[in-house]
């Protein structure tokens, strides 16, 4: 199994330096990862750094709280794509979901999907904050809104991906959508377990260590 093609090689820390981003890009070129995932401010730099490779540039929208308005998320999406983003990982409005305002949750996702054009949209549900029923509901809403993936976590909340969450999300969306496990893979065994549970993408800062079969010390 080519695990490298499952990995979104990630650096989303707010204090990330240019040299760290450059290292991320160099590793993506060397290990042929599916994508790099960086904050919007680094998208243009990442696009230039990955020219001539198959690696995509993934960025985040409404990150990490999901509490900006739909209009702001749509603008972020459009600007990111103009700057070279190939994939958008957006955070849902968790508060709206918890309040039972499902129409707002769906329209919020749809705003990003519509702004993204033909680019891939992954919907971060922040599973660690949700009940199982809420996880099911929001995955269904993401599917209804036309998103391409559901994603477990930002990596900035109280927990990351779990095998149980990945299985539940896969069962909910079926084969129509991808499932991204983020914030829980720190070793080759972890990554393999997520793939075996149904994950089609893994978000991690430990991509190199995973491929080397080493235990990583990163949180995301």
Curated annotation (Swiss-Prot):
<feature type="active site" description="Proton donor/acceptor">
    <location>
        <position position="89"/>
    </location>
</feature>
<comment type="function">
    <text>Catalyzes a reversible aldol reaction between acetaldehyde and D-glyceraldehyde 3-phosphate to generate 2-deoxy-D-ribose 5-phosphate.</text>
</comment>
<dbReference type="InterPro" id="IPR011343">
    <property type="entry name" value="DeoC"/>
</dbReference>
<dbReference type="InterPro" id="IPR028581">
    <property type="entry name" value="DeoC_typeI"/>
</dbReference>
<dbReference type="GO" id="GO:0006018">
    <property type="term" value="P:2-deoxyribose 1-phosphate catabolic process"/>
</dbReference>
<keyword id="KW-0456">Lyase</keyword>
<dbReference type="InterPro" id="IPR013785">
    <property type="entry name" value="Aldolase_TIM"/>
</dbReference>
<keyword id="KW-0704">Schiff base</keyword>
<feature type="active site" description="Schiff-base intermediate with acetaldehyde">
    <location>
        <position position="151"/>
    </location>
</feature>
<protein>
    <recommendedName>
        <fullName>Deoxyribose-phosphate aldolase</fullName>
        <ecNumber>4.1.2.4</ecNumber>
    </recommendedName>
</protein>
<dbReference type="GO" id="GO:0004139">
    <property type="term" value="F:deoxyribose-phosphate aldolase activity"/>
</dbReference>
<comment type="similarity">
    <text>Belongs to the DeoC/FbaB aldolase family. DeoC type 1 subfamily.</text>
</comment>
<dbReference type="GO" id="GO:0016052">
    <property type="term" value="P:carbohydrate catabolic process"/>
</dbReference>
<dbReference type="InterPro" id="IPR002915">
    <property type="entry name" value="DeoC/FbaB/LacD_aldolase"/>
</dbReference>
<dbReference type="Pfam" id="PF01791">
    <property type="entry name" value="DeoC"/>
</dbReference>
<comment type="pathway">
    <text>Carbohydrate degradation; 2-deoxy-D-ribose 1-phosphate degradation; D-glyceraldehyde 3-phosphate and acetaldehyde from 2-deoxy-alpha-D-ribose 1-phosphate: step 2/2.</text>
</comment>
<keyword id="KW-0963">Cytoplasm</keyword>
<feature type="active site" description="Proton donor/acceptor">
    <location>
        <position position="180"/>
    </location>
</feature>
<dbReference type="GO" id="GO:0005737">
    <property type="term" value="C:cytoplasm"/>
</dbReference>
<dbReference type="GO" id="GO:0009264">
    <property type="term" value="P:deoxyribonucleotide catabolic process"/>
</dbReference>
